[in-house]
Amino acid sequence: MRTLLYILFACFWICSVPAGVRAGDHKAEKEKKLSVDGPYVFHLPDGGLRVIAVNKERKLTDTVYAEVPENLLLTVIPHKYGHPFQVRLQKPERQPWNMMPAEKILVLSDPHGDFHSFISILRAQKVIDEEYNWSFGKNQLVVIGDVFDRGEDVTAIFWLLYKLQQEALAAGGRSLFLLGNHEEMELRGNVRYAKDKYKNLADTLKVKYKD
């Protein structure tokens, strides 16, 4: 009887190991799933444009244009909080290195991918309206770094700042962004504070996250 119990225990242990491995593999596969992100815009050497994004259905879209379309509108979808918004792609321009201060200057730092908190502060200070449009007139918004890391909406915040830069300039104001230490870390490839969603997308595209 004791021998039979040993045999049954051994069989149970042997059978349970593959099941455990499969469960671990399933967990790893689940963690590798893409989540809403982007768009990422690449100016190609031949003058074309590549736009990569992940939509709400977690579907990856990868669009290549032979040349940069005029007035191209990009849709940005926050990860969880907030509503989608559109951004018009502009030609890259070098910004002035100095400027006169405005009557009002709002200085922020360290949004760290937290879109909900970021827009809540901007709304409370009358910098944007409910639709994320610039409402700060001729005043200035200055974000002194650390948009990267920790949160799920790094790209959404960057695109919102890009949008506000255009709208502020049209209104006679300014929206400015300065690099922080977390931007410098990411550009060097130090991704220990980045959320897995960004690393998963980079792995899917077979590129390094810093690129």
Predicted features by range, described:
Residues M1-D25:
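Bacterial Sec-dependent N-terminal signal peptides
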